[in-house]
Amino acid sequence: MAQPNYSGIIKFIFTPITSLTTIYIFFSEEYAWRGFLQNIFFDKFGKKLGVIILGMCWSLWHLPLIFTLYTPEAPILGIILRSIHIVGISIFLGYLYIKTKNIWFCAIIHVLNNSAFLITNSKESTITYHDILIVSMVVLIFYVPFLFTKEYKNNLE
């Protein structure tokens, strides 16, 4: 007699639980970085420098993931690549939070960002200097211009 296959039922039960847990994790991270720390960094360093330093700190926060999950095969290049990207996305998420005061928008963009990196990142690939150049160009073209919006006008003046 064949054993019943419960995999569909298990996926049906655990997918919503996993999704809720994932959303909670991203919401919590954005609540801490954008909702709490961003204003502290803005008050201490001004908005432009504050968001860059916040992005650097956020990059340090991700070091364990960079070493173990994202790029264990090329840790130094991985740190450079991911740090550039994390500072860039931090600029955009900071802008988004200033404009909307909505942590949920930041959490959703964070989820989409991480999903895009997981989809494009293959275990068989090794990070190269070319990858760093491409990510740096994307950050310069798409994220850095947000530093020059009125929302990032320096509040230390």
Predicted regions, residues:
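Membrane-helix interface segments
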Residues: 46-50, 75-79, 99-104, 127-129
